[in-house]
Swiss-Prot record:
InterPro entries: Aldolase_TIM (IPR013785), OMPdecase (IPR014732), OMPdecase_AS (IPR018089), OMPdecase_bac (IPR047596), OMPdeCOase_dom (IPR001754), RibuloseP-bd_barrel (IPR011060). This is Orotidine 5'-phosphate decarboxylase. CDD domains: OMP_decarboxylase_like (cd04725). Belongs to the OMP decarboxylase family. Type 1 subfamily. Its EC number is 4.1.1.23. GO terms for molecular function: orotidine-5'-phosphate decarboxylase activity. Homodimer. Catalyzes the decarboxylation of orotidine 5'-monophosphate (OMP) to uridine 5'-monophosphate (UMP). It is an enzyme of class 4 (lyase). It comes from the Bacteria. Pathway: Pyrimidine metabolism; UMP biosynthesis via de novo pathway; UMP from orotate: step 2/2. Gene3D superfamilies: Aldolase class I (3.20.20.70). GO terms for biological process: 'de novo' pyrimidine nucleobase biosynthetic process; 'de novo' UMP biosynthetic process.
Amino acid sequence: MSACQTPLIVALDFPTREAALKLADQLDPALCRVKVGKELFTSSASGIVETLCDKGFEVFLDLKFHDIPNTTAMAVKAAAEMGVWMVNVHCSGGLRMMAACREELAKRSGPQPLLIGVTVLTSMEREDLAGIGLDVDPQEQVLRLAALAQKAGMDGLVCSALEAPALKAAHPSLQLVTPGIRPAGSAQDDQRRILTPRQALDAGSDYLVIGRPISQAADPAQALAAVVAEIRG
């Protein structure tokens, strides 16, 4: 497997396996990792992760597991057995759920994927949180969940780049994965709390998830190269 030389993760947000692999074939595993989300994973039935790994990609399995502790831990174990590089769970599942996942991965003799907690989705603002009974700012809720993740032994968090400085200050050992990244001049789409790649890295993010600016570009390879150049400045 080629070691990726950048913090970029390209989201393979497609409805079919064929479309996802068509994009993957245009990308260099040395310049990006790839993310497999719910739609692609579900529609592909099985094998998409293994196929991407065989192509040299490190795979972030973005299924945001959230269930009772044992069920979630077994799902994380299954993801590890597929060879994923990173897997995530919802921090709102609680301390016992996250700790169970950590303990299950610790039993493995082989490589362990990074175990990442999802805090507050980047599409959510204060009024969205209020709608589910949380009368708090997104950043305050992120910090609450981050403290739980740290206590549970998680490797990192998914968070907005706007929350990254506070998270790095409070939990410097956690690796921060930031979606909602848009290169300068890109449309915001449905992501609300966004920054450019360079701004996100400067804010403390360790990994950057980019979707449509690359996946929907006329030339995805060129779009990826442009983002790499923007990062390297």
